[in-house]
Amino acid sequence: MLKLIQNNREITALIAILCLFGLLSVIDHQYFSLQTVTLVFSSAQILILLAMGATLVMLTRNIDVSVGSIAGLCAVIMGMSLNAGFSLSVSCLLTLLLGMCAGFFNGALVTWLKIPAIVTTLGTLGLYRGLMLLLTDGKWIEGLPDELKRLSAPLWLNISPIGWLLMILILAMAWILAKTPFGRSFYATGDNLQGARQLGVRTDSIQIIAFSVNGVMAALAGIVFASQIGFIPNQTGSGLEMRAIAACVLGGISLLGGTGTVIGAILGAFFLTQINSGLVLLKLPAWWNDFIAGFVLLAVLIFDGRLRCAIEKNIRQQKYARFLKNDKSNQVT
């Protein structure tokens, strides 16, 4: 039973989502509907993108706490580019390039200079956030064009163009991680770094790619943020990194690396966003969001640690069970 839960964390996250849907449907009978699912999915798109990027980094046994600042900085660059007269496609390209460079910088510091990931990204968190405020002079960016806002406008099945693009990205990343040698390299790097090197995996390159893709996902999150609300506050992205990590852990991504799937992380992001919608339904203040996200993260970490200890204990018992049986039989004879 313990192994079943450990090996199927996506199913447990899905069950949690369905249970929460059931609970909220008791309060409001119209809550459990296709419209609600699409609305929650639309609200979850930013967190899903950040969780997808965080998945790659965490699989390699690293962590990035600067993604919220990267998303905010990229949103600012997006807004400034559009207001400067650049086309939407050029502005998006510049934004994605900036996100990739920011992620690459994090990865280079971690792999080439051997600075611990948590220390590196704590430093760049302040660096990117400060650069964002310097560029805007602490002001909001407003007056964004309608063509940007149309990216998040409902389309077929009440899902926006960005929503459909996101689903394609989810399927592509899930397939790459599960079915390709390149994808399995992320698991090998996080599970056993030295062993992966002996098998020919270019672990430094894999880690840099993980951070770079993480930066691109953060840039996409910044674009989605700008398109959804139509302006860019000076605190855009603040606190999102903790929610992204919480979503990954909730979905079964191990902080020790080498374990988990991107589908699990996405379900975790959906669940956390669903909690937010539940708070709106219950008419609770918005500042409960961070408290609940922190509580869920702590609870999942405790559960994950206890589950891991229980599984290891069970494996040890099975390993030495036959020796104990032999000792007992010798004592009887």
From Swiss-Prot:
Belongs to the binding-protein-dependent transport system permease family. AraH/RbsC subfamily. It holds the Pfam family BPD_transp_2. It comes from the Bacteria. GO terms for cellular component: plasma membrane. Its main location: membrane. Keywords: Cell inner membrane, Cell membrane, Membrane, Transmembrane, Transmembrane helix, Transport. Part of the ABC transporter complex LsrABCD involved in autoinducer 2 (AI-2) import. Probably responsible for the translocation of the substrate across the membrane. It is a multi-pass membrane protein. The gene is lsrC. InterPro entries: ABC_transp_permease. The chain crosses the membrane at residues 14-34, 39-59, 70-90, 93-113, 115-135, 157-177, 206-226, 252-272, 284-304. The complex is composed of two ATP-binding proteins (LsrA), two transmembrane proteins (LsrC and LsrD) and a solute-binding protein (LsrB). It is found in: Cell inner membrane. This is Autoinducer 2 import system permease protein LsrC. One of its GO terms (molecular function) is transmembrane transporter activity.
